[in-house]
Every structure is written in structure tokens, then in C-alpha cells.
Amino acid sequence: MKKINVITLGCSKNTVDSEHLMARLAAAGYEVLFDSDRTDAKVVVINTCGFIGDAKQESIDMILRAAAAKQAGKIERLFVVGCLSERYADELRAEIPEVDDYFGARTWDGIVRALGASEDPALATERRLTTPKHYAYLKISEGCNWKCGYCAIPLIRGAHVSVPMEELEEEARKLAGQGVRELMVIAQDTTYYGIDLYGRRMLAELLRRLCRIDGIEWIRLHYAYPAGFPDEVIEAMASEPKICKYLDIPFQHISDAQLASMHRRHTKAEACLLYTSDAADEED
């Protein structure tokens, strides 16, 4: 059985992408590893980050390390996927030709075909978990519609695309069946969830549905954009014991002038109103 090592760099969204890829590779007969300290597998896939300077450098360093291992005969095939290669594919091909091929953050079918893995849609909700067994990330959407002045995510990941609720419920059930007890709900902007599919923000409804899944005991919300934050989410947190009283919100700044220069879509007053919402006060 041929070993393949999937090295994941960057954020938790990348982790989910890698876990889906690993499930398809395992179904194709690969022995799948996920160890960033090893470059001795016959095939290596590096899932990169291209967001900030330090992350880009970390990705480049890992690619160069693996390329050197390939030149030394330790690796037979080397592939690079993810945000860095989505953003800089031409430059990377020119500078690091040892890589067999580069695939972006939106071309997962390409790497699946290159490695002979299954393209069966039924595997779309399968995961080879790399997190501690009691929790897993649940990515509810891809991309972002906001155009913040400092952020390249819309360029890299494209427009916001929500995953249908039924698919997320099925994925959560499978995760619960694998022993997962806590869901970390993630996206580029979790609070925007549903607008493209249902015509309105549906995060609160999704959270309530996830609460009904047997085996899931805690649900923790991450990447909640403050602009347009739905009051229904606070109400769901107050009434549903499985939803952790926790919010990961990137306020970024509290100066209206600075927020405007960053092209953020909320003000100081709106941020303060969210922080002091009636539902939150009632829960306290």
C-alpha cells in the first residue's frame, strides 16, 4: 500500500479540506499520514496558506523542504494545493518546478483525479479526522462576499457559498458516529450563512438543527462577522444548552475612522450594541 502524507498549514478551514481529501485517498487504497515533520512518504500533498506574510513564508519553506526531499529520492511525487497555489500558481511553477503539479483552493477535483482518488459525491461528507477525537470542525460555507481592504480571502476563496443544511446535518451525524462530541462551527463568515441558499441569514436555524443530533453535546461558534449579526443567534445561545456561551468575533478595531479605512461594514456603535444585546444580558 502506497503511503501518502497530507501536510496541512494555515487555518481550520484548511484542516477540513485536508480531512475530506484524506478520506477520498484512503478510499483509493492509500495509507494516509498527516505529519508535517515527515517527508519520507512516496507521495506528499501540501495544503498551503496564502493569507498573511508569515503563513506564506511557512508554506514556501515547507514546499522547498519537500522539493529537496524529492530531489534526494525520498519522495516520488509532490503536489501543492490550497490558498498559496490559488494565488501564486504561475510564480510557484516557475520558481519551484520540482513540484509535480499545483492546485488551488477551488480545484479539489484536480488533485483528486491526479491521485486516482474517488470522485464519488457520497464521500463528500466523509472525514479522516486529524483533531483530537472529541471535537471536529464543521465548515458551513466557503468563500466570502465582504471586500475588506486588507483581506485577500474573496480573491482566493471566491464568493460566499453556503452548504445546504441537510448536508451539514448528515456530516454532523457522521462525526457524532466517529465519537465527536463538540462541533466547532467555522466558515469565512458564519453569520452570513444561508443568504445565498435561503434568501436570509439562517445560522440560528442551523444551530438549532445541530442541537437535535444525538451524540453532539457542545456546539461552539467561530468566525462570526459582526456586521449584520443575527439576533436570533443570541436567542438560540440563550435557549439551547448545547450551544456554548462563546462567540469568536473579529471586531478588528473600535475606531470608526479606522474601520472605514479597512472597509469593514460595522461601526463602533454597532459593535457595542452587539456586545450589550438584551439576550446576552438575560443569559448573564
Description of each model-found segment:
Residues 1-193, 232, 243, 247, ...:
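Proteins enriched for Cys/Gly/acidic motifs involved in redox and nucleic-acid/cofactor modification
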Residues 50, 157-158, 197-200, 260-266:
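Short glycine-enriched, charge-decorated loop/helix-capping segments at active-site entrances
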Residues 60-63, 199-205, 267:
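Charged helix-capping and loop-helix junction motifs
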Residues 189-193, 217, 226-229, 242-268:
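Conserved radical SAM core fold
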Residues 197-199, 230-240:
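Distinct, well-ordered alpha-helical segments
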Residues 275-280:
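Conserved small/polar residues in nucleotide/adenosyl-binding loops
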